[in-house]
Amino acid sequence: MKLDEFTIGQVFKTKSLKVSKDDIMRFAGEFDPQYMHVDEEKASKGRFNGIIASGIQTLAISFKLWIEEGFYGDDIIAGTEMNHMTFIKPVYPDDELFTIVEVLDKQPKRNELGILTVLLSTYNQKEVKVFEGELSVLIKR
């Protein structure tokens, strides 16, 4: 979709994605190797009583779920900004996540381009919000 096809206040819901313990440990091993993500024994004695997903992974999953819906298609040029990211609740192995996306703003620019800002709100299978953040992209008008 082009910038002008989006409406402020428009809401989309993505499909869901189940996050396995192996997914969590593989991602964290490469990108966020803190004990609560990679060390089951130590994590079991910690605040969350077990392995949890990295917030960076939760952000990446949220973005993936939105992008896979295909609304940007070939009209997206580039991401421009991420703001107000909040990791609200932990994501545990076997949680199933989905994202609600709300169009917050659209700013036409020159050269047939514009900036689209959306709010990504990600929930688990119990409909508990685990992540929220704003994403802005440069997109064709």
Swiss-Prot record:
Residues 8-112 form the MaoC-like domain. It holds the Pfam family MaoC_dehydratas. It comes from the Bacteria. InterPro entries: HotDog_dom_sf (IPR029069), MaoC-like_dom (IPR002539), MCH/BMMD (IPR052342). This is Uncharacterized protein YdeM. It comes from Bacillus subtilis (strain 168).
